[in-house]
């Protein structure tokens, strides 16, 4: 593979995460405007965004098999056509059914693109470099989550219709589409070059189960925590502005942590540092949940920084459980994380209704403790060390 080709594929990976981050995180900014557009209460409008999450989940799950049937370049180019149709649907339709369908299509495109982006990084980079590259790639999710809400605020403040926000997000896919030209993608399944050697079916092992449970619990815990921090902070007498600042500080610290750990991870065994980070994150969340408002700003900054590397390290370790990175395995771990996203309000909503926001935060804390236990148990069964030794020879 030529260096320029590798750079193009890496940028496709970066932008695939930026696309998903923009679509998921911008929701809260535009929901009120969309509710007004359809003359609906915000509470019922929020349910239609489940179609976006459902599209992401289904496409990540199915793409584990589709990757071996449909070439990656074809998928990305077809995704561009779907993106144009979805944004056009948002712009020109006043039907809630068509809006929901467009959201589902955006989710499908986003999920397919992100699963391809993740696979490209695991395919192109080996060992510890794979972990640091995946982490840097994931930072584009957070970066888009900071940039696109600002773009949305800029447009909405000038009374520009909400659907132009999605048109701006579509420009990310335009860049991906342009990068596919003159770019060679790894061939998989029936498109892969034929070899005389028999294909070895490699068992995943129990380590993949531990990592999948960790991925689900981590994302469910993180989103369950950050979704209810504003309500919890307001209950302690903080202003809405200060409560919002806590969430902003978390994501800012999270992004800085990703950049820092993309360098730091190269010097440590991934399973050991993952266990340490998961333990630290559980402790810091407990400090936030039980501490006084005076210490909340510092503890959430520390939590954002030290938890930033957990999810991508889980995915990296998953990809290292087999000698050759398996798209099915990587997508399985990603799917478990996405299920965590889908379950966020299903799990935390009833808890808040019956016991208040702090109960939801303590539940999230318990989920982080489960992540720590899974990472600790992984140390006894993980195959990443033997596969790293093989690739280094």
Swiss-Prot record:
InterPro entries reported in the protein's UniProt record: MFS, MFS_dom, MFS_trans_sf, MFS_TsgA, MFS_TsgA-like
Transmembrane portions of the chain: 11-31, 51-71, 78-98, 101-121, 134-154, 162-182, 206-226, 245-265, 273-293, 297-317, 332-352, 361-381
Pfam families associated with the record: MFS_1 (PF07690)
Stored Gene3D superfamilies: MFS general substrate transporter like domains
A single Gene Ontology CC term: plasma membrane
Signal peptide segment: none
Principal subcellular localisation of the protein: membrane
Topology of this chain in the membrane: Multi-pass membrane protein
GO molecular function, one term: transmembrane transporter activity
Keywords, alphabetical: Cell inner membrane, Cell membrane, Membrane, Transmembrane, Transmembrane helix
Classification via HAMAP family: MFS_TsgA (MF_01044)
Family to which the UniProt record says this protein belongs: Belongs to the major facilitator superfamily. TsgA family.
Record protein name field: Protein TsgA
Taxonomic source organism: Escherichia coli O81 (strain ED1a)
């Amino acid at each position: 593979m030529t260096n320029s080709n590798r750079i193009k594929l890496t940028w496709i990976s970066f932008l695939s995460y930026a696309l998903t981050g923009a679509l998921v995180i911008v929701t809260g900014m535009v929901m009120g405007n969309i509710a007004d557009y359809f003359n609906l209460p915000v509470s019922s409008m929020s349910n239609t965004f489940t179609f976006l999450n459902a599209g992401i989940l289904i496409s990540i799950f199915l793409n584990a098999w589709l990757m071996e049937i449909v070439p990656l370049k074809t998928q990305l180019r077809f995704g561009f056509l779907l993106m144009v149709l979805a944004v056009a649907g948002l712009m020109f339709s006043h039907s809630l059914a068509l809006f929901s369908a467009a959201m589902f299509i955006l989710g499908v495109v986003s999920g397919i693109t992100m699963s391809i982006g993740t696979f490209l990084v695991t395919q192109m980079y080996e060992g510890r470099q794979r972990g640091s590259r995946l982490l840097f790639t994931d930072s584009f999710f957070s970066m888009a989550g900071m940039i696109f809400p600002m773009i949305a605020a800029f447009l909405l403040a000038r009374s520009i219709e909400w659907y132009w926000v999605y048109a701006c997000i579509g420009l990310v896919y335009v860049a991906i589409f342009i990068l596919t030209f003159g770019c060679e993608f790894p061939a998989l399944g029936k498109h892969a070059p034929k070899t005389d050697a028999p294909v070895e079916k490699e068992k995943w092992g129990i380590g993949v189960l531990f990592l999948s449970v960790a991925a689900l619990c981590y994302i469910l815990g993180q989103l369950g925590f950050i979704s209810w921090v504003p309500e919890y902070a307001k209950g302690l007498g903080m202003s809405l502005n200060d409560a919002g600042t806590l969430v902003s500080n978390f994501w800012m610290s999270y992004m800085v942590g990703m950049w820092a750990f993309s360098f730091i991870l190269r010097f440590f065994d991934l399973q050991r540092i993952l266990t340490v980070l998961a333990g630290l994150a559980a402790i810091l969340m407990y400090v936030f949940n039980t501490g006084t408002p005076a210490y909340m700003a510092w503890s959430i900054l520390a939590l954002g920084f030290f938890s930033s590397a957990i999810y991508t390290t889980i995915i990296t370790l998953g990809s290292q459980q087999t000698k050759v990175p398996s798209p099915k395995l990587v997508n399985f771990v990603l799917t478990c994380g996405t299920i965590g996203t889908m379950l966020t309000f299903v799990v935390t909503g009833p808890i808040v209704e019956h016991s208040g926001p702090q109960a939801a935060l303590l539940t999230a804390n318990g989920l982080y403790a489960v992540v720590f236990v899974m990472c600790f148990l992984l140390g006894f069964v993980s195959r990443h060390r033997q596969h790293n030794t093989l690739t280094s020879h």
